[in-house]
Amino acid sequence: MDHRSSIITPGDLERILCDGTADPKALPLSLLEKITDGFSDEHQIGSGGFAVVYKGKLETRTVAVKRMSDAYMDEKVFHREVECLMMIKHKNIIRFVGYCANTQGSMERYDKKFVMADVHQRLLCFEYLSKGSLDKYITDISRGLQWRYRYQIITGICQGLHYLHQKKIVHLDLKPANILLDDYLVPKITDFGLSRCFGEMQSRVVTKIAGTFGYLAPESFNNTEVTYRNSYRLDIYSLGVVIIEILTGEKGYHDVDNVRTFSVFFQTYAIFFSHFRSKIISL
């Protein structure tokens, strides 16, 4: 991965956003610090277990800067996500602007003395979508959302996922929280931290499948080896759950953090699936 990025400016980011054919760039840490006001709390727009997201202000546009937490500092995972993002350009996939992989020495106190330690900064830069995630539309707005918009959102998600599968990329964590909406409610798939890019290596085996309870297919839990030929089906299962939630206007679970066993998880979903037809909003 080429980390030479010293000449990139805020104006370059503007041009990348305006040019749909422009490739993502390696970005200097100083640039990302500047546009987020030093990663200030005022610019923070979201956070999770693995990253904090900041709003980056350009002259006429805005970007989202995803700053990985220390717990996420797995080089292979970061490189895999960047690899997937560099390969994709589609109207239903979040626009990837660039990345930063910065490592510098810092004197840190350890065992009553100072030692030189490597400080890793890993960041991703995307287009900014002010409407936020599909999550809130399912729980609130979708009950009154016109069918044509629900149809548009479902169609867009399907097209984006189909594009990924054509590129031999499986997402493996498709859910409403990982689908953003633009000002016209056009959906864009995001968060490729768990994705796998098979490319020509379609026989490559994935032995560890992660994801989110409620959207994981049952076969994700049986410890079988997964290749591209069967892993894309996991995305299709997740897609089905997302579609059901868009149609019903509610989730199939209420507090997934309290699910302690797979048996409780599957029982909950069995009840949901048996009743979802009666919950679909009238067209």
Task: For each feature predicted by the language model, list its residue ranges.
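Conserved N-lobe loop of protein kinases adjacent to the ATP-binding glycine-rich P-loop
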Residues: 57-63
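Cytosolic eukaryotic protein kinase-like domains
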Residues: 2-23, 27-31, 63-86, 92-152, ...
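Conserved N-lobe motifs of Hanks-type protein kinase catalytic domains
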Residues: 48, 88-91, 167
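Protein kinase catalytic-loop region centered on the HRD/HxD motif
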Residues: 159-169
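Conserved N-terminal boundary motif of the eukaryotic protein kinase catalytic domain
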Residues: 29, 34-43
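Protein kinase glycine-rich loop
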Residues: 42-53
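Catalytic-loop of the protein kinase fold
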Residues: 169-181
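Catalytic core of carbohydrate-active enzymes
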Residues: 156
